[in-house]
């Protein structure tokens, strides 16, 4: 294990975090929020000291960097980012309990959007900004940001890190160099964010609100800056957010292909077509089920479309209390929470690509049972899928199910209902945000015990990092062997 290389890398990640805290510190100065502003000063100072120590201890690090280091580095980096990222909330005492501050920022970086806050609007503006920015940074990935804007280092450095942090069953190159791929993804991501801000400003949303909302939308994080999330905003602003949530649930590679003029490749993409089909089907079924629930058809369609978009993209904004909807509609929403967005997007969940591969693999197994001598390949977009990817998908599904049920049992010690516990785990592990009943869109996670909050923090990080970069931190083999 190349510990020195990992230490230097974590120092770079912390440096980026410290730099990104500067705008929040400036906002604290502008708004005269003295206590909150100084909390950022102390945090940045703590980061600077830690970075200095790591750089001194890790001088002369070997350049070799392999898959195991990549996975471990990603897992540790996100934990360290969260430990330092929560300090402004805790030092300012705006979130007095450290575990609550840690839960809040883990929810931010993992783009979950679950909160322990009873009154979001009581937070200082600079802390609201940092809270919202955390899930924008976590959306595409802080490590992807580092790869996009620094040089390549060491053997396999970029590929191992991008593979470990990127969502989906496989990491593909848009261009030959992985650094260039990371740069393209971030440029598209920034462009989507700016475009989202512009459309929100056209709807007369205040600039601060527009920026924070765009962070939550493009990062599919869903931290609202108002206690009612998006409910108090105009229908236009809600519709704009619906569109951008759905767009950010699409594989970002599709946008690169669009920029290259490869429209046919985009429209023939099987995952995209399945994603669109699921979205449209869910909206139609929920609208039919909600007949008479709202005053007008327009309101019904708007809330149905927004809620479908917020859950399948794993954003977590809300315009209505969907916990009051009929059971059929809530069942559809739970299915969307499980499926999630497309691979290569900023969304969470199992991913549409994995669902597609699992269904095709199941179909192949049925055919082979009926015709044992028949050789049949699983194909995606006309190309054969590597058997290793199928095996990894099956392993991911097994780990996915096990973690959900173990977490469900563990947090059940708090005595909440089965629905509350199950949807709380689904919301955190799939990076959704709200669940049902006691963790519904008008509630929060503050009532859970410290132990349950730690379990849910594990779920949020494991869900965002596709399980294994977090899971391997708890295995002996990771630390015993070279």
Question: What kind of feature is each model-predicted range?
Answer:
Residues 1-482:
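Membrane-proximal intracellular helices of multi-pass ion channels
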